Amino acid sequence: MADRVRKPEWLKINIGANDRYTETKRIVDSHCLHTICSSGRCPNMGECWGKGTATFMIGGDICTRSCKFCNTQTGRPHPLDANEPTHVAESIALMKLDHAVVTSVDRDDLPDLGAGHWAHTIREIKRLNPQTTIEVLIPDFQGRICLLYTSDAA
C-alpha cells in the first residue's frame, strides 16, 4: 500500500479559536441558532467566525432536499421555531454586524415553503438593527413567484 501524501501546510485550514470566534460561537449557541458555516462544514468558518461574523441559516438545520453540493442534513424537518426570527435579530445586534447574511434550508414541507418565516425574520432584523444591511440568500420557492413577493415585502 502506498504512503499517504500529507497536505502542504499552506493548504491546511487553521480553525484558530480566538476571542471573536469564541464569542460568535457563544452567541449562536446561546440563541439556539444554525449557521450554514457549521451545517455545511464550510472550510472558511474559522476565518469568518474569527472576525465575528457568520451566515445565519433559518428554518432549522434539516433540509427537505438533497443537493449534491451541500453538506446540510436532509430529511423531515422539525416544526419552525417561532422565536428564531427574534433570536437571529438579537444575535446580529450582539455581534454588532453592519451587514448580516441570512440563508435557509429548503422547507418544501410547508404550504408557503417558508416564505412567511423569511418575511418575519427580515422584519425582526430591521426592527432591532435598523442600520444593518441584510443580504438574503433565499431558496427557489419552487418557482412560485407569489412566495417571492411574500419575502420581498419585508
Give residue ranges: language-model regions.
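Iron-sulfur (Fe-S) cluster-binding segments and ferredoxin-like electron-carrier domains
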Residues: 46-56, 71-83
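Conserved small/polar residues in nucleotide/adenosyl-binding loops
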Residues: 149-154
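Short secondary-structure boundary segments
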Residues: 104
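Short acidic/polar active-site loop segments enriched in Thr and Asp
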Residues: 98
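Flexible, acidic/Gly-rich N-terminal and inter-domain linker regions that tether
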Residues: 1-66
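Canonical radical SAM enzyme core domain
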Residues: 74-92, 107-148
